From Swiss-Prot:
Family the UniProt entry places it in: Belongs to the flavodoxin family.
Keyword terms: Electron transport, Flavoprotein, FMN, Transport
PANTHER family: FLAVODOXIN 1 (PTHR42809:SF1), FLAVODOXIN 2 (PTHR42809)
One GO MF term attached to the UniProt entry: FMN binding
Role summary: Low-potential electron donor to a number of redox enzymes.
InterPro entries listed in its UniProt record: Flav_short, Flavdoxin-like, Flavodoxin, Flavodoxin/NO_synth, Flavodoxin_CS, Flavoprotein-like_sf
Flavodoxin-like domain span: 4-143
Cofactor(s) it depends on: FMN
Organism field: Megalodesulfovibrio gigas
Name of the featured protein: Flavodoxin
Domain of life of the native organism: Bacteria
Length: 147
C-alpha cells in the first residue's frame, strides 16, 4: 500500500494528538508509517522513500503567521526535503479568534507546492482541542485522494 511519513510540531499536545490519530488511520489502511516529532528530524532527504508526507503544525501569533517553534527549522529548510513529485497533506491546530487562523497550514502547503510537491487540497484546520473523529475522517479522505 505504500509508505507514509507524518511529521508534527506541537506545543500544547493538540497537534501531536492529531498526528497520532492520522498515523493510526494510515497504518490501519495497510501503509507503513513513520511518525516523527519535528524536533527529531532534519530536512535533508526527509521525504525520500515515502509515497505520502503529512505535515502537522500549530499556528501562533495574532499579527502575523507564526509556525510552532519546533517546526520552524524544518520549514526553513524544506527545499532540501525532496518533496518534488511526492503527495503531501497538511493539518494544524489553531484558534479561530486569531486573524490568521491555522495560517501555518496554508504556509506549509504553499511552500510544499512551490517545491513541486503534489499537495492534496484537503487542509485540516482544527479550532482548539482536537476532535479525533474529525482527524480520522480527514485521514481517510487523504488516503482516498492520494490513491
Amino acid at each position: 500500500m505504500g509508505k507514509a511519513l507524518v511529521v508534527f510540531g506541537s506545543t500544547t499536545g493538540n497537534t501531536e494528538t492529531v498526528a497520532e490519530v492520522v498515523a493510526k488511520v494510515l497504518e490501519e489502511s495497510g501503509m507503513a508509517v513513520d511518525l516523527k516529532n519535528a524536533t527529531k528530524v532534519k530536512a535533508a532527504g526527509l521525504a525520500e522513500g515515502y509515497d505520502l508526507v503529512v505535515f502537522g503544525c500549530s499556528t501562533w501569533g495574532d499579527d502575523e503567521i507564526e509556525l510552532q517553534e519546533d517546526f520552524i527549522p524544518l520549514y526553513d529548510d524544506l527545499g532540501a526535503a525532496g518533496l518534488g513529485g511526492r503527495k503531501v497533506a497538511v493539518f494544524g491546530c489553531g484558534d479561530s479568534s486569531y486573524t490568521h487562523f491555522c495560517g501555518a497550514v496554508d504556509a506549509i502547503a504553499e511552500k510544499a507546492a512551490s517545491l513541486g510537491a503534489k499537495v492534496i487540497d484537503l487542509p485540516l484546520k482544527i479550532d482548539g482541542a482536537p476532535d479525533t473523529a474529525e482527524a480520522r475522517d480527514w485521514a481517510k479522505e487523504v488516503l482516498r485522494s492520494a490513491a
